């Protein structure tokens, strides 16, 4: 297929603004320096008689076109127009011909002649004015799309300090929630599309990078050309069991045919600090006797002792180009991100190479792509080890070190450890390596019929090792010496895919068909070992057998291997008539070894319709209306179970051990019951949408309304033993419903030669409801308490109940404090207010629903401004109508504890007369639930395109400064009201152990050569 058939096209209204942003981002369409191997040929060309031609490229309105390609036909000699549409090019001779092209306009050719000034006016190409979006196994003209699909191009990505690809589109796609909720440099974004649909299955959308399944962290953000989101089931059903949570399609940048070699560098440096810290007592308040602490005479800022101003630097270099028959691209990225907490970091090096070659008069195309990533991070799991918690609750009058240089500890207090010692008395290396190789062979024997064979292998290897010294708190408190561990894991996915597609247009008809086969084979294997009580800390993890725990049978050793194949047959037919009526049908038949013997296979169909009302004759008089299209779709998708052998009886050999007559023996125990009827969760979704554009597409948008029902939901049911071998069985029984509305509005309020303002607003609402938890065979209570807090509270904070949504807080409603300093709690049965007693904790007479953790409204607001060489963009996100459990307040806003306290403990709750006394134990009451509403300045970026004189090497430089998480408008008292909500069993809980979110300031540079 010719190169121009595959171009990503822009809508007319966004064309010039997108180009401005494209150029300011330093994306490479600029001329390149001469490669070393071409030096001799350049000398020869210079000796020939050359002609210089210059001029201005404009559109039909007389406005300059920025970034238009000016090429000397038949060569790689060329340039692009500047911000005034001007160009200058030296060509070989007067017989040369210039080819002028730009996306959205007809390509023109003009003879050079004697050179001089040649102004050019490009004409609109109406066939190119409709943007192309990526759908499953192909692309589609936006005007023909009948499903809920959102597309974000590179020029609209969020700039600044970007951790993974999800952050590029945060707040830009209605219904897609992206949150990190953590400052951990190794944390990935949590993504959820259209609510919670499963109790046991995953909630993250399927991510495909150039058609290959992968994670958002497996691709460099700088290398992404577009991100397309398949939101409804009619679009995602062609991916079957993997598409129930939606599909995110990432397309990377590649070289173009007959284009000059272009090179680009982009890099940034960033400084980060905690976005907010909690206000605890300092040493002076301790000396005033406001806690039970003994004054040790020091003044220690524990949080400062374990934190720093974190430095991040990121560098990306890419090169791309192409000849008549070959394209190539390569890029290299290095990134090191420090965490604000000491010894937390993320260091990564990623390389990518892609080459394509056409032969036999474009009948055959061969492509090879390789991605290699090396990742390294430290051994500190700051959240898991409670470093932040230990720092905020520790006595500020205690020292960090003893006089002998060891870390000061006070083991008389439970769960109380020196956070600096936790960091310094351990060492380790966590390395991972990811390799992805993909090959494609595309055969096009006749025009418009393509058959493609794709082979891919993805291998991820993790190699982790670590050591706790004899002074580490867990070893020291239990009278053990050093502890060492070592593990290696490898995850391999082999993928074979064959697709054949055909498209044809005649008269007013359009027809597209696709059939395909996919085979995916996954293998996971690894081993791990640990030992402790070492005579010396010298060897670290390098001599595992030296620890004496091995001789006592207390050392650990394990290995595992599991595999599973996934097979799919799929097809799709799309038909359109007269650019008015469109229909799309798809089906996938899929089989997996993960399911029971009776349900290995399932079928996932979909249908969607589109009616472009604005193209009807009766709409011809409405010149202000550019587009009005009604869409409707229905589809079935599935959720696949995580473990390979859940449908089988599984035995655990080696645990537990038992000791008999001086010898350790391995035991054998049952790990799971068989279930031959185990099958896919099934999600059925109906979506109706409306796309519109007015005023020459200066104002456009979409609205979608949907309802999604999940049936045969997986749940671990308690079963009797005997007759069962194990007390739990994974089975299909539950039902859940999600329904909502999504709105997106795009506008260009101002557009002149020197100034442009673009703005986008997204809004979404989703309502979740659990419909059932049982069936005729498996039954459980319609009310299940969960989301337990840790020691010493140890209470559930939420209740899952049929007929209600997930994330329902459930507990005691407090209304004040008694004169005895105890909570006053509402009795739900009598309505009376009673003083707190321990008997209330498990008595439903004193517990009630207190609010929900799932926001009712999600907002995103994105703005970009361009004034001459300056550009400014900012992004705001918000969530409204939900509750947050402030766990740090529940623990440290209390006068009975043996730890440090929040200063707010001095404030009388509910504006009353009394504060909590030392008699009131830590517990969960409604006082610790807060409104979570917020509006956050997620990112703001100011950029400047540096004017350059004509240069042989550097064509464009853009510098920018950026701030992330700059401020948050909220009434919430905790660190950050933006919850990651990755675990549906603990929604809306602001954990005391979490890694606090950070605020970052960035300076970046983009250079095109």
Predicted regions: what is each one?
Residues 1-353, 358-359, 364-367, 371-373, ...:
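Short, small/polar-rich motifs associated with maturation and membrane association
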């Amino acid at each position: 297929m010719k190169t121009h058939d595959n171009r990503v096209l822009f809508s007319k209204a966004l064309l010039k603004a997108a180009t401005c942003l494209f150029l300011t981002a330093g994306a490479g369409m600029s001329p390149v320096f001469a490669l070393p191997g071409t030096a001799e040929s350049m000398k020869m060309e210079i000796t020939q008689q050359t002609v210089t031609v210059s001029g201005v490229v404009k559109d039909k309105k007389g406005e300059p076109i920025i970034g238009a390609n000016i090429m000397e036909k038949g060569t790689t000699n060329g340039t692009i127009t500047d911000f005034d549409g001007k160009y200058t090019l030296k060509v070989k001779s007067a017989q040369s011909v210039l080819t002028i092209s730009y996306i959205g306009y007809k390509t023109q050719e003009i003879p050079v002649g004697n050179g001089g000034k040649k102004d050019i006016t490009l004409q609109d190409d109406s066939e190119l004015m409709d943007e192309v979006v990526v759908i499953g196994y192909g692309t589609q003209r936006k005007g023909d799309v009948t499903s809920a699909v959102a597309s974000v191009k590179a020029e609209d990505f969020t700039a600044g300090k970007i951790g993974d690809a999800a952050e590029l589109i945060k707040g830009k796609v209605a219904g897609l929630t992206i949150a990190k909720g953590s400052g951990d440099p190794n944390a990935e974004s949590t993504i959820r599309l259209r609510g919670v649909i499963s109790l046991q299955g995953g909630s993250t959308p399927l991510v495909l990078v150039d058609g290959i399944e992968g994670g958002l962290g497996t691709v460099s953000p700088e290398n992404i050309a577009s991100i397309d989101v398949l939101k409804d089931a009619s679009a995602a059903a062609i991916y079957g069991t993997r598409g129930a949570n939606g599909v995110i399609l990432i397309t990377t940048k590649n070289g173009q045919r007959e284009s000059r070699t272009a090179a680009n560098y982009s890099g940034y440096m960033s400084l980060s600090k905690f976005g907010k810290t909690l206000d605890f007592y300092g040493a002076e308040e301790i000396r005033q006797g406001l806690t039970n602490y003994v004054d040790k005479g020091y003044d220690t800022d524990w949080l400062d002792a374990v934190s720093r101003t974190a430095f991040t630097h990121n560098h990306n270099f890419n090169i791309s180009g192409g000849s008549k028959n070959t394209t190539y691209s390569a890029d290299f990225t290095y990134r090191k991100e420090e965490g604000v907490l000491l010894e937390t970091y993320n260091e990564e090096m990623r390389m990518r190479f892609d080459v394509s070659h056409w032969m036999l008069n474009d009948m055959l195309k061969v492509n090879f792509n390789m991605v290699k990533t090396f990742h390294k991070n430290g051994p500190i799991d700051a959240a898991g080890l409670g470093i932040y918690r230990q720092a905020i609750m520790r006595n500020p009058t205690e020292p960090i070190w003893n006089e002998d240089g060891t870390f000061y500890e006070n083991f008389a207090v439970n769960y109380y450890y020196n956070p600096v010692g936790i960091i310094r008395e351990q060492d380790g290396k966590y390395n991972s390596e990811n390799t992805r190789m993909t090959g494609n062979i595309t055969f096009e024997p006749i025009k418009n019929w393509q058959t493609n064979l794709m082979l891919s292998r993805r291998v991820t290897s993790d190699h982790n090792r670590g050591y706790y010294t004899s002074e580490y708190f867990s070893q020291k408190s239990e009278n053990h010496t050093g502890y060492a561990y070592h593990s290696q894991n490898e995850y391999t996915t082999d993928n074979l895919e064959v697709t054949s597609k055909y498209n044809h247009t005649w008269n007013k008809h359009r027809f597209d068909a696709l059939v395909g086969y996919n085979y995916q084979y996954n293998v996971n294997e690894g081993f791990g070992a640990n030992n402790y009580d070492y005579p010396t800390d010298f060897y670290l993890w390098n001599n595992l057998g030296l620890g004496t725990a091995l001789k006592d049978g207390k050392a650990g050793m394990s290995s595992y291997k599991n595999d599973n194949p996934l097979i799919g047959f799929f097809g799709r037919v799309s038909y359109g008539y007269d650019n008015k009526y469109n229909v799309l049908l798809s089906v996938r038949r899929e089989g997996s070894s993960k399911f029971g013997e009776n349900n290995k296979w399932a079928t996932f169909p979909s249908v969607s319709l589109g009616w472009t009302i604005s193209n009807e004759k009766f709409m011809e008089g409405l010149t202000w209306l550019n587009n009005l299209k009604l869409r409707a779709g229905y589809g079935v998708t599935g959720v696949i179970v995580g473990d390979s052998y859940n449908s089988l009886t599984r035995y655990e050999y080696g645990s537990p051990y038992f000791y008999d007559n001086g010898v350790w023996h391995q035991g054998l125990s049952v790990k799971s019951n068989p279930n031959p009827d185990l099958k896919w969760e099934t999600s059925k979704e109906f979506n109706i949408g409306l796309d519109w554009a007015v005023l020459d597409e200066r104002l456009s948008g979409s609205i979608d309304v949907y309802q999604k029902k999940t049936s045969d939901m997986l749940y671990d049911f308690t079963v009797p033993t005997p007759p069962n071998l194990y007390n739990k069985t994974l089975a299909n029984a539950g039902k859940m419903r999600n329904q909502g509305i999504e709105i997106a509005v795009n506008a260009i309020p101002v557009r002149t030669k020197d100034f442009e303002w673009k703005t986008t607003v997204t809004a979404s609402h989703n309502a979740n409801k659990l419909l059932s938890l049982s069936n005729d065979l498996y039954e459980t209570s319609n009310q299940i308490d969960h989301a337990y807090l840790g020691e010493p509270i140890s209470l559930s904070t939420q209740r899952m109940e049929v007929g209600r949504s997930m994330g329902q807080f459930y507990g005691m409603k407090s209304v004040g404090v008694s004169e005895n300093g105890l909570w006053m709690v509402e009795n739900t049965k009598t309505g009376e207010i009673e003083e707190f007693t321990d008997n209330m904790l498990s008595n439903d007479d004193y517990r009630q629903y207190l609010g929900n953790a799932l926001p009712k409204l999600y907002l995103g607001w994105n703005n970009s401004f361009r004034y001459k060489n300056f550009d400014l963009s900012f992004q705001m996100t918000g969530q409204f109508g939900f509750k947050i459990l402030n766990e740090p307040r529940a623990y440290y806003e209390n006068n009975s504890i043996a730890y440090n306290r929040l200063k707010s403990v001095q404030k009388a709750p509910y504006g009353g007369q009394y504060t909590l006394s030392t008699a009131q134990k830590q517990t969960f009451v409604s006082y610790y639930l807060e409104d979570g509403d917020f509006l956050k300045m997620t990112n703001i970026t100011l950029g400047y395109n540096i004017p350059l004189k004509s240069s042989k090497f550097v064509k464009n430089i853009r510098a920018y400064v950026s701030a992330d998480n700059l401020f948050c408008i909220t009434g919430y008292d905790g660190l950050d009201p933006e919850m990651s909500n990755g675990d549906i069993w603990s929604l809306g809980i602001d954990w005391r152990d979490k890694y606090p979110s950070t605020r970052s300031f960035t300076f970046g540079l983009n250079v095109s050569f």
